[in-house]
Amino acid sequence: MELSPSVVREHDRAAPDPSETGTATFGLGCFWGPDARFGALEGVVRTRVGYAGGTRTDPSYHALGDHTEVVQVDFDPERTSYRALAGRALDAHDPNRQVRTTQYQNVVFAVTAAQRETLAAVLEERGLQADAIETRIERLDRFYPAEDYHQKHSLRGTPGLQPVFDELGYDDVELRESPAAAKLNGAAGGYDVGGDLGAGLDLAAGPR
């Protein structure tokens, strides 16, 4: 099956509406890798990268202030959960170690009381406590999307993928928020995504 604009369009049309999804936000070093890793996961609908956790208003990559690079994940609660995603975030690094540079620190954000309770349970399952680990456990006050060139970085760097979205007339925001782009970015990052999109992608050469 070839990856074609029609496949991308139908995948996006069939995806859950943003109002039907939950959201999780994590800092796990440079946000390019986590964007691909989480985008490939079952139940993840959309991803975007950005900045959070600091006090500077309207940060940018070159004026980051005390913010951290993060990936924000929208997920279908009927197919995955905040618990599962937070567990993956914790398992992706050593919670007992932290890098010095705030930009690349490990942080797990919890927005609601339910997420905070869930996160405490996930930590307990691993024999961890929020106040005894190096990973930052914080409430999310505000998320600032990163510049367009940081969004779907693996997809943008894989020959033949972005032109599919260009042919559909997607602008940068639509590419960032595209469920198909999240999956294809994961595939371009080396992860198995399966389904209609994965069937049409040759990781070595882009779309067949």
Listing of model-derived features with the role each one plays in the protein:
Residues 1-208:
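Flexible coil/turn and secondary-structure edge motifs
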